[in-house]
């Protein structure tokens, strides 16, 4: 935590270098100004950065108002994030509690009633505005991450149930504003072009070399994946506002149950079964040294069995995955791997992060692609037993 006036109060002063102390003090002042100028939350008293995020920067903050302490999450959206995307995310989060889904955080409105603040910034490159949002703080523990996802069987069962509940709750909502992203079936052809360009312009890092070595295999796998499901089939599958990033790191746990679902910044309109494919990719793929990239079929089966127990609510047409969805699901697990690989590759060549760290993500995705190729028939047979 960074308390008011001095980060040194949170730890021995000798542990803070002068430069770090200045940075933390400046950060506190910056966020304190935002909270007081744009929100009616009282006085900011502590700040702690959430180190797990990759795209946006989030902080766990505490405020004091009328003698009462309250906790929130403050998010600084990455520069270049389209405001209509933010509006879509916030409209979805507003819709969920109105439909009875109480596991998601609430968006805290600004003094002028907006769901986010636009904070003017001045940089050497020019002036622009940073979008800031504040969310209610969810109870529970952060136990896992997307690259350390192997929760217990009981937690895995509950995760599938919560995803099914989320889908059943939001089905029928048609979105808000003018925001529209390509569906995964439209993204795959774009990935082929982008990956070719990255290979052509790559450097000599461990990431570049591994990507170049496996690029032909990846591109061929992508092109083959475009054959099914066809657009005609895909268009008939149930569409809804998918979470788009449903993994154990975006869940809070209290005792043995899920107490919160957060990070809706990847939400978009797409098929329900793509969201399920993404969840299976995240929850059921090993990151262990001797089995990295293996899809753990016992976990896949447990996840699907738990998801399929959902029943359609009165007036809803959703429910368990249908036969056409199950027939498409293995293809969408592969597409989910490609989707995350596309993020990994794009993030590396855009922001130039640690090459070894991102090479690990890349290797994981390549290994899963190969596992899927070698075990395709058995995976398809398993999934189709859930009809």
Q: What positions do the PLM features span?
A:
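Conserved NTP-binding catalytic cores of kinases and kinase-like/nucleotidyltransferase enzymes
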Residues: 1-114, 257, 384-387
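An alpha-helical support segment within catalytic cores of ATP-dependent transferases
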Residues: 27-38, 195-244
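A cross-family kinase active-site recognition segment
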Residues: 146-212, 239
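ATP/Mg2+ or Mg2+-diphosphate-binding catalytic cores
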Residues: 19, 339-387
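ATP-binding pocket architecture of kinase catalytic cores
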Residues: 68-177
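Active-site activation/catalytic loop segments of kinase-like enzymes and analogous catalytic loops
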Residues: 273-316, 334-352
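A glycine-centered beta->alpha junction motif in the catalytic cores
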Residues: 113, 134-148, 197-204, 338-355
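Active-site acidic catalytic loop and adjacent metal/ATP-binding pocket
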Residues: 51-64, 68-73, 107, 226-274
